[in-house]
Amino acid sequence: MSLLKKKDEKKTEQERVEERREEVLAKGRKFKYPLQWTKHRIVINTILISIIILAIIVVGGWLALYRLGMTDELLYRITKIVPASVATVDNEAVRFSDYLMLYRSSMTSIERQSGSQFDQSSVESLRAEYKRIALTEAEKYTFAASLAKQLDIEVTKEEVAAEFDRHLKIGGIDRSEEGFLKIISDNFGMDKSEYERMLYLSLLKSKVSIAIDENANKIAGQVEKLLSENNNNYGAVAEQLGDAVSYEETGGLVDSKNIDGGRASEAMKLEPGASSGKFVSMNGDGYYFVKLIKKTDSEANFVSIKVPFSEFDKRFNELVESQKINESIKIVDPNNQ
């Protein structure tokens, strides 16, 4: 009897321990679950706040770019990261960053001089004018890129590097890269990657223009043939071809650094009376032929014939007329409202 009583007492003691354990665990759960709920709520609130901030940034950026037409440095940097489009050309997106790059490079020197040379009204008109020019140019580059895909045309990194090196030596001056980058930064507000981007776009458009302009290639062939038959008489050849070409004489010595599409620097390579073969103008708008009349160490007197490219602009204008170019911004000159 006493043995059964001890077993009962022992069992009762174990039960008391279990009960105590459950009480402790139950009290712990009261603290555990509210803490988990609080952490969960903090995570949700953080996500919601992040979404709200992101939405404010997106809406603010959209208003700044598409409604207010802002072009400041921060927005430009954002468009280089975020693939925003400023227009479409035959359903191909025009990069906002390209438009801003072209516009900002054109306006940099003017805005730096505006305090002394231009009144505010003139500056605003210039901004509207250069925005229009930059947007049209960006649209043309996009159209060129679209045609390049169709024609399997590309511009390699090596070609861009070679063109960059050529620009270092424009005018016969062997500039250092550091010095040249300072020049483009001071005058255009561009760094090397931006300048290389501009060179890439220009080279691509030039290659496409050459590939599609059968008429210009045909006329250039006629110029070569006629020059050979007429002892390099540029005036006579230009007269025969009429409006298909343009003829120009310097009328005297001009600086070899003259900004003329590369004609002066090309003439400096020749001997008097010699004629160059055809070469593409530095801005890619046509072929040039040059004949040297006279030169010194730093100047040249020459005549030239230009065969302009026209097919690219013709096709682009057809897109404009058929309303296949849709712009996401409105460019308005405040002085003409």
Regions found by a protein language model. Give the residues of each.
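Short, low-structural-confidence N-terminal segments
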Residues: 1-125, 262, 266, 284, ...
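N-terminal targeting/tethering segments
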Residues: 73-190, 194
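Solvent-exposed, acidic/flexible segments
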Residues: 80, 92-96, 123-132, 136-141, ...
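Proteostasis/folding factors centered on peptidyl-prolyl cis-trans isomerases
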Residues: 181-210, 262-306
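Peptidyl-prolyl cis-trans isomerase
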Residues: 225-266, 294-301
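Extracellularly exposed regions in secreted/surface proteins, prominently low-complexity, repeat-rich
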Residues: 298-299, 305-337
